[in-house]
Amino acid sequence: MWGSGELLVAWFLVLAADGTTEHVYRPSRRVCTVGISGGSISETFVQRVYQPYLTTCDGHRACSTYRTIYRTAYRRSPGVTPARPRYACCPGWKRTSGLPGACGAAICQPPCGNGGSCIRPGHCRCPVGWQGDTCQTDVDECSTGEASCPQRCVNTVGSYWCQGWEGQSPSADGTRCLSKEGPSPVAPNPTAGVDSMAREEVYRLQARVDVLEQKLQLVLAPLHSLASRSTEHGLQDPGSLLAHSFQQLDRIDSLSEQVSFLEEHLGSCSCKKDL
């Protein structure tokens, strides 16, 4: 006697031998009806056949004669076999290997690339580092912020790696920077030299203010006498000269404000503590 497991295996073997790769055997999930099959009935009958053969006649002569034999033959009956539906996997699905009659494998056209898997018709599940309808596009982890590099991030096809400072080496997976033997290098200070540059700018503006003040004294000294003499000698109104003097005053005032602003912020500069 066979056990239940052996009977089940035998039943699957019968189904696999009897069916085709296109059709399944009963309606179920992702299985569609593709047509109705039917046709004439084939039946057997006894057919009479006359078979010639040689024999000897009187006088030892060879004679030919016939004998009747009967054999089983097949013929089409006028009747029609009962119609029955035919089933196949619905569009976008195909037979699952090892499971007769099951349509559990999705179809993606074009197929998924770079290690992606087809999870439903026309939709791929992409591995880490790839994106797109068929997993054809590399993900730039450096620009999207997915990478966690503390220093420089370098994108590669399907992944990325971190480039460390001098004296550091990348980790096994390339996503971190590890210090080599010895003291860790100090990262460059981007604010180095800012204090000295600000001081030089203050000195330069102060020198310009001094020059403009000297010019202003030269202009204002003869201003009153110039106005009186111009009236006595019938000269034109010296308003243009006065307007020029006021412009010089405005320039001096503007430069003084710039010097004050730099001096005020120079004291609060964080990099000053490193000097």
Swiss-Prot record:
Signal peptide residue numbers: 1-21
Gene Ontology CC: one annotated term: extracellular region
GO molecular function: calcium ion binding; Notch binding
Sections of the chain in a coiled coil: 196-220
Cysteine-cysteine disulfides: C32-C90, C57-C63, C89-C103, C108-C118, C112-C124, C126-C135, C142-C153, C149-C162
Keywords for this protein: Angiogenesis, Calcium, Cell adhesion, Coiled coil, Developmental protein, Differentiation, Disulfide bond, EGF-like domain, Repeat, Secreted, Signal
Pfam families given in the database record: EGF_CA, EMI
Ranges where the record places region Disordered: 173-193
Residue ranges annotated as motif Cell attachment site: 131-133
Boundaries of every EMI domain copy: 28-105
Tissue specificity as recorded in UniProt: Expressed specifically by endothelial cells of the highly vascularized organs heart, lung and kidney.
Subcellular location: Secreted, Extracellular space
Domain EGF-like: 104-136, 138-178
GO biological process, one term: negative regulation of smooth muscle cell migration
Function: Regulates vascular tubulogenesis in vivo. Inhibits platelet-derived growth factor (PDGF)-BB-induced smooth muscle cell migration and promotes endothelial cell adhesion to the extracellular matrix and angiogenesis.
Subunit structure: Interacts with ITGAV/ITGB3 in an RGD-dependent manner, increasing endothelial cell's motility.
Name by which UniProt lists this protein: Epidermal growth factor-like protein 7
